[in-house]
């Protein structure tokens, strides 16, 4: 990268309580051409004691939030607090004119999220929600195929994002604080892709269930209705080897697309080639009619593409491909499915 082409973004991280916080920091520090990481803050003693010695934060100063705000020429903040503090923290940052990369979901207070979006628009701040499936190369192939009309008019989408936390009692207890339980935490990844393809649904109907007699909704289904299509979103944290069977299926009048798994597992996570099974009624692009296995390449760095885009958006080198209006509609749809008033 040429020095005269992009200004390095001076960035700090507020919060280490989000489960993606350490990986996010590792990525920021691995992109020194784009980011100058100047510090980190965590006001919750529980999360500070649990995670401040992680290697991701080695050598970085732990500061108070006010000390971070006082850093000269600070451009942006990555907000990685525990989920219940994301919006309140983001609002304080936005009010100070800082560009925001915020982990997800965006809180159960929809009016707070709406206020955040409004401030970002008024102050011309970059706002990036950390939904990483939108950068998944196989799902990007699917979205491009849909956009280019390869599979005709969509009439059905089936999506699943599950995992097995049957023995992870601490995580199950943490999930139970949210009205939608596990569905609240994971369904937004899938809804994001659906809304990018089909837009806002006409109606959202959800079925939120428990596999155990405890406080956690650990098995959820939402049906998004459109004039000529339905899309289902399933989330469970009780599916044995559920990560292996995360999937996205799109059916159209002239073909279909199927991705399973959405992400590779374990040691192959970053390196295994993701494959889409595509069936076409007519020849499209370089593909003949019929069924194809399309190699879409490996995931690579989970957050690299997204954070590089964040820097480019701040520097006005690109327009945010996921505008505030989309983020607002996505969060509204998620909260509706979780039974949260919006």
Q: Which residue ranges define each predicted feature?
A:
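Predominantly a Rossmann-like dinucleotide-binding segment in NAD(P)-dependent oxidoreductases
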Residues: 133-213
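Rossmann-fold dehydrogenase core element
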Residues: 115-133, 153-156
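Hydrophobic residues in well-ordered beta-strands that form the structural core
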Residues: 102, 127-129, 158, 259
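N-terminal Rossmann-like dinucleotide-binding module
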Residues: 2-56, 311
């Amino acid at each position: 990268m040429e020095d005269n082409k992009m200004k390095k973004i001076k960035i700090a991280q507020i919060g280490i309580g989000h489960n993606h916080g350490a990986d996010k920091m590792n990525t920021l520090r691995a992109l020194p051409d784009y980011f100058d990481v100047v510090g980190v803050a965590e006001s919750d003693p529980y999360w500070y004691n649990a995670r401040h010695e992680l290697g991701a934060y080695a050598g970085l100063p732990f500061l108070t939030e006010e000390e971070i705000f006082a850093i000269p020429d600070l451009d942006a903040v990555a907000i990685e607090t525990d989920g219940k503090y994301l919006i309140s923290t983001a609002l304080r940052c936005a009010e100070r004119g800082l560009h925001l990369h915020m982990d997800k979901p965006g809180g159960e207070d929809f009016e707070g999220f709406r206020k955040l979006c409004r401030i970002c628009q008024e102050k011309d701040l970059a706002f990036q929600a950390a939904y990483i499936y939108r950068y998944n190369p196989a799902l990007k192939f699917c979205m491009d195929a849909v956009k280019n009309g390869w599979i005709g008019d969509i009439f059905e989408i089936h999506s699943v994002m599950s995992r097995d936390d049957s023995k992870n009692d601490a995580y199950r207890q943490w999930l139970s604080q949210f009205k939608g339980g596990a569905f609240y935490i994971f369904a937004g990844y899938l809804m994001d892709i659906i809304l990018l393809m089909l837009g806002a649904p006409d109606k959202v109907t959800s079925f939120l269930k428990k596999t155990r007699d405890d406080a956690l909704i650990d098995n959820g289904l939402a049906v998004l209705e459109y004039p000529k299509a339905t899309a289902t979103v399933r989330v469970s944290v009780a599916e044995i080897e559920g990560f292996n069977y995360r999937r996205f299926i799109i059916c159209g009048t002239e073909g279909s697309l199927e991705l399973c798994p959405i992400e590779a597992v374990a040691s192959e996570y970053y390196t295994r080639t993701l494959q889409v099974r595509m069936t076409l009624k007519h020849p499209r692009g370089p593909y003949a009619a019929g069924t194809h296995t399309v190699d879409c390449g490996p995931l690579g760095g989970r957050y690299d593409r997204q954070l590089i885009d964040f820097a480019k958006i701040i520097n006005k080198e690109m327009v945010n491909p996921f505008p505030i209006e989309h983020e607002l509609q996505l969060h509204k749809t998620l909260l509706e499915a979780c039974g949260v008033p919006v």
